[in-house]
């Protein structure tokens, strides 16, 4: 599951759990982005903070792991590089790339997008009632859409809530709430 995870929240965890159950996955690997090329217009928290929050959020689920592949690579991060790395490390595994359906709708803007579908099956998750018109050019055998239980949670809302001093309990796992407070993350972003 790729994402900025700034911060990771319960919606991410529910989506990962739902996809794992539907596709009978042995493991879901969370891959916090290093320097996401598509988010250069906004401040993104330090990759180490995002990695540690994701680690804390997933630690209780034995099916979840967190990879540093994008963080350790350095520089702008692209999904194609991550999938090539994962394919090299796991040549016999069937890879699924879990992302938001809104991000999946933009996949033709991603670097080397044609090769992406050779490396992994893409799962776009959306909330109930969210209408998504996917490009007809997407290969049907390499892309699935999955509606997950609606959780009105977003990373941007969590950052804004912290910035204005509002509580974030139950929006993100307790360990992440404590980590954000300890590191004073998002407090200057109202």
Curated annotation (Swiss-Prot):
Catalyzes the reversible adenylation of nicotinate mononucleotide (NaMN) to nicotinic acid adenine dinucleotide (NaAD). HAMAP family: NaMN_adenylyltr. It catalyses: nicotinate beta-D-ribonucleotide + ATP + H(+) = deamido-NAD(+) + diphosphate. The keyword RNA-binding does not apply. InterPro entries: Cyt_trans-like (IPR004821), NadD/NMNAT (IPR005248), Rossmann-like_a/b/a_fold (IPR014729). The gene is nadD. GO terms for molecular function: ATP binding; nicotinate-nucleotide adenylyltransferase activity. This is Probable nicotinate-nucleotide adenylyltransferase. It comes from the Bacteria.
